[in-house]
């Protein structure tokens, strides 16, 4: 087990999460008593208690007063906020995890983008206009792309779509910095944003779905062509 965390709390958190992932503390099992676990990890009981509370909020554990702490099946109890952690724990699964991430984005975007353009065209155009002034680099395009999708999600009038995008931000941003390092990816994205703007201007709402699906396929092809040179630390968490 290689743990890169620098603080005692960060170390304890990574130790417990990796132990759950590697079935040292399997789902459904009971964690060791607080004193035993703090000695095992090498942190104070106060630090451990704070970490356990945080992991419980993220769905890894169930803490009940007067009862032992139980390890959850995190696939059933956690939210989107653990995506980065999963990518860091299992590098081999990162390509599939990212494919799933992009598929989810495309699928839900077909709903909220069309709704935003149809019912709130002025707001949608304001969001899409950001593409006119973006700097031609990966960092700027990553922020722009996330900002446009998130902005249109909230502009749809259903804030739940925006909250979903909020949950995807961490891994989305890491993937974007690598994906948009490719000039072809940046060029394709600009074409896509301009197309959406045109559809908004012409009230061609029925074409939004096909526009999104086409962009999903074309951007997916670029992404797959880049997977062979994907850096191994793409999903490394900052601590």
Swiss-Prot record:
GO-annotated cellular components = cytoplasm
DNA-binding residues: 34-53
Q: Which CDD domains match?
A: WHTH_GntR
Task: Report the protein's function.
Answer: Multifunctional regulator of fatty acid metabolism. Represses transcription of at least eight genes required for fatty acid transport and beta-oxidation including fadA, fadB, fadD, fadL and fadE. Activates transcription of at least three genes required for unsaturated fatty acid biosynthesis: fabA, fabB and iclR, the gene encoding the transcriptional regulator of the aceBAK operon encoding the glyoxylate shunt enzymes. Binding of FadR is specifically inhibited by long chain fatty acyl-CoA compounds.
Question: What GO MF annotations does this protein's record show?
Answer: DNA binding; DNA-binding transcription factor activity; fatty-acyl-CoA binding
List, for all copies, the residue spans of the domain called HTH gntR-type: 6-74
Q: Which NCBIfam families match?
A: fadR_gamma (TIGR02812), PRK04984.1 (NF003444)
The protein's superkingdom reads: Bacteria
| Protein name in the entry | Fatty acid metabolism regulator protein
Q: Which InterPro entries match?
A: FA-response_TF_FadR, FadR_C, TF_FadR/GntR_C, Tscrpt_reg_HTH_GntR, WH-like_DNA-bd_sf, WH_DNA-bd_sf
- Kindly state which keywords UniProt assigns to this record, in alphabetical order: Activator, Cytoplasm, DNA-binding, Fatty acid metabolism, Lipid metabolism, Repressor, Transcription, Transcription regulation
Which HAMAP family is this protein grouped with? Answer: HTH_FadR
């Amino acid at each position: 087990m290689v743990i890169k965390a620098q603080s005692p709390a960060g170390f304890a958190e990574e130790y417990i999460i990796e132990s759950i992932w590697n079935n040292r503390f399997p789902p459904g099992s009971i964690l060791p008593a607080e004193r035993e676990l703090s000695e095992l990890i090498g942190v104070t009981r106060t630090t451990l208690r704070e970490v356990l509370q945080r992991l419980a909020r993220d769905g890894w554990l169930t803490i009940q007063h007067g009862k032992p702490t139980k390890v959850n099946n995190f696939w059933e109890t956690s939210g989107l906020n653990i995506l980065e952690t999963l990518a860091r724990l299992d590098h081999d699964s990162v390509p599939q995890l990212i494919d799933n991430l992009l598929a989810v984005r495309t699928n839900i975007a077909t709903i909220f983008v069309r709704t935003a353009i149809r019912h709130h065209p002025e707001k949608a155009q304001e969001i899409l206009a950001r593409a006119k002034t973006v700097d031609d680099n990966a960092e700027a395009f990553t922020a722009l792309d996330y900002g446009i999708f998130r902005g249109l999600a909230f502009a749809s009038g259903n804030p739940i779509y925006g909250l979903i995008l909020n949950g995807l931000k961490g891994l989305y941003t890491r993937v974007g910095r690598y994906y948009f390092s490719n000039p072809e990816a940046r060029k394709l994205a600009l074409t896509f944003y301009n197309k959406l703007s045109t559809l908004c201007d012409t009230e061609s709402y029925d074409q939004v779905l096909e526009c999104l699906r086409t962009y999903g396929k074309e951007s997916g092809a670029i992404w797959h062509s880049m997977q062979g040179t994907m850096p191994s630390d793409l999903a490394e968490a900052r601590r």
